[in-house]
Amino acid sequence: MFANISISEFDPELAQAIASEDERQEAHIELIASENYCSPAVMEAQGSKLTNKYAEGYPGKRYYGGCEFVDVIEQMAIDRAKELFGADYANVQPHAGSQANSAVYLALLNPGDTVLGMSLAHGGHLTHGAKVSFSGKTYNAVQYGLNAETGEIDYEEVERLALEHKPRMIVAGFSAYSRVVDWQRFRDIADKVGAYLFVDMAHVAGLVAAGVYPNPVQIADVTTTTTHKTLRGPRSGLILAKANEEIEKKLQSAVFPGNQGGPLMHAIAAKAICFKEAMSDDFKAYQQQVVKNAQAMAEVFIARGYDVVSGGTDNHLFLLSLIKQDVTGKDADAWLGAAHITVNKNSVPNDPRSPFVTSGIRIGTPAVTTRGFGEAEVRELAGWIADVIDSKGDEKVIADVKAKVEAVCAKFPVYAK
């Protein structure tokens, strides 16, 4: 029998680290595009007794007994995911977005097959063919990028590379791209060369669910996403697909037993909650505000003389180039962190600096919008960021901005005390 003892009583050192993180989340402004704040209900599910249950297999086809209730939970998550995204198939077991992506590769490809994906340096993801990832080591990865003049995806290059290399699979999706992706254009290119079309919509899944960004699910052969970011659920993954019995069978076996063992039932329950939350009118209004806030911030930076890659944004994020300011992304990240504004350094297209230094920062609005920030607050925030960068990290400017950040964070708490 376990003693009824708290973390602070049992492990004060760990409790202090957790408390410090709690304080950081409340007292700092979060602008990392892939981060958000999930609801108390989502966190409650993740801390439930479901964490104790092993459930290898799928609902009704488990390798362990005692799964009658987790079967209900997983089927609920599956049904809600299909309804939310208009999918014919859903697998809610992937532990994360990268695991979902690796399962797709395992299901549809053989080692050495050619994959055409977006370059990491131009806004793609590690799992889209980067050399340091399994996707670039196991498969023959060919990379496309952005048009140098527009800062948007170079679809002509995508088509040229597809015709030249005849990939088995084309990957559409991104981790740092601010415009609407033409999913149908990718579909047409894939069909020309007989390739699968795989869409990774991890960054925009919440926008898609709310109908403020085009839905790729019935266009692509397979679509994956994380369940955090704009979807505002637990840190986990999801695979979706349109009807295709052969692909569905391959995906099922690629996730289990191909890529994972037992599913995380506490996380799956949390996904079921976040899918239900995403069906609400409040969630739709939230996603609309996320985009409005990102566009408002981009406008301020442009007015202050900064270059925004592609000239603006249609979603929740944008890349701010600091080449003209002769500031590195690494320095800007550090200066803003000292002012309690969290961003991440990010390479910009054709960046002359290394990925560890970079010439830009990525800014996203999902978390600040969850806090309740509207256009007025984010415009003011963008001005503070520009002040810090323009000052080249002047200590007085940082201190002044930090005080303003603390005041606005107190006005807009993440969680009610």
Swiss-Prot record:
GO terms for biological process: glycine biosynthetic process from serine; tetrahydrofolate interconversion. Pathway: One-carbon metabolism; tetrahydrofolate interconversion; Amino-acid biosynthesis; glycine biosynthesis; glycine from L-serine: step 1/1. One of its GO terms (molecular function) is glycine hydroxymethyltransferase activity. InterPro entries: PyrdxlP-dep_Trfase, PyrdxlP-dep_Trfase_major, PyrdxlP-dep_Trfase_small, Ser_HO-MeTrfase, Ser_HO-MeTrfase-like, Ser_HO-MeTrfase_PLP_BS, SHMT-like_dom. (6S)-5,6,7,8-tetrahydrofolate binds at L120, G124, H125, L126, S354, P355, F356. Keywords: Amino-acid biosynthesis, Cytoplasm, One-carbon metabolism, Pyridoxal phosphate, Transferase. One of its GO terms (cellular component) is cytosol. Its main location: cytoplasm. The keyword Transferase applies. It is found in: Cytoplasm. Its EC number is 2.1.2.1. It catalyses: (6R)-5,10-methylene-5,6,7,8-tetrahydrofolate + glycine + H2O = (6S)-5,6,7,8-tetrahydrofolate + L-serine. Homodimer. Catalyzes the reversible interconversion of serine and glycine with tetrahydrofolate (THF) serving as the one-carbon carrier. This reaction serves as the major source of one-carbon groups required for the biosynthesis of purines, thymidylate, methionine, and other important biomolecules. Also exhibits THF-independent aldolase activity toward beta-hydroxyamino acids, producing glycine and aldehydes, via a retro-aldol mechanism. Belongs to the SHMT family. This is Serine hydroxymethyltransferase. It comes from Acinetobacter baumannii (strain ATCC 17978 / DSM 105126 / CIP 53.77 / LMG 1025 / NCDC KC755 / 5377). The lineage of its organism: Bacteria, Pseudomonadati, Pseudomonadota, Gammaproteobacteria, Moraxellales. The gene is glyA.
